[in-house]
Amino acid sequence: MSFLGMGRPQPTSEQKIAAVESEMRMMADTYNRLQQSCQKKCVPNDYREGELNKGESVCLDRCTAKFLDTSMKVSEIMQQQGQALGGQQGGGGMF
């Protein structure tokens, strides 16, 4: 509960569900971009074997690690910029 009604209003159940759905869409989009990017880079279009060979497996592992690391760094920078922008406007930012 807010002190003297000065706090932010609590989100409704519908708002919470919408936020979770939005987050799920973003996670699915990130996964799809990761899968497409790393498969294009590491796995040839003409499959020679039923399983990944060692080189393909290592490439996919490294590609995934780099993709996720880059995504985290971009997210952190966007949050910092959002907070800085929110501070300049004198109000709460989106992030």
UniProtKB/Swiss-Prot annotation:
GO terms for molecular function: metal ion binding. GO terms for biological process: protein insertion into mitochondrial inner membrane. The twin CX3C motif contains 4 conserved Cys residues that form 2 disulfide bonds in the mitochondrial intermembrane space. However, during the transit of TIM10 from cytoplasm into mitochondrion, the Cys residues probably coordinate zinc, thereby preventing folding and allowing its transfer across mitochondrial outer membrane. A motif (Twin CX3C motif) lies at residues 38-63. Mitochondrial intermembrane chaperone that participates in the import and insertion of multi-pass transmembrane proteins into the mitochondrial inner membrane. Also required for the transfer of beta-barrel precursors from the TOM complex to the sorting and assembly machinery (SAM complex) of the outer membrane. Acts as a chaperone-like protein that protects the hydrophobic precursors from aggregation and guide them through the mitochondrial intermembrane space. Disulfide bonds join 38-63, 42-59. It is a peripheral membrane protein. SUPFAM superfamilies: Tim10-like. Pfam families: zf-Tim10_DDP. Its main location: mitochondrion. Keywords: Chaperone, Disulfide bond, Membrane, Metal-binding, Mitochondrion, Mitochondrion inner membrane, Protein transport, Translocation, Transport, Zinc. Gene3D superfamilies: Mitochondrial import inner membrane translocase subunit tim13 like domains. GO terms for cellular component: mitochondrial inner membrane. Signal peptide: none annotated. Heterohexamer; composed of 3 copies of TIM9 and 3 copies of TIM10, named soluble 70 kDa complex. Associates directly with the TIM22 complex, whose core is composed of TIM22 and TIM54. Interacts with the transmembrane regions of multi-pass transmembrane proteins in transit. Belongs to the small Tim family. InterPro entries: Tim10-like, Tim10-like_dom_sf. It is found in: Mitochondrion inner membrane. This is Mitochondrial import inner membrane translocase subunit TIM10.
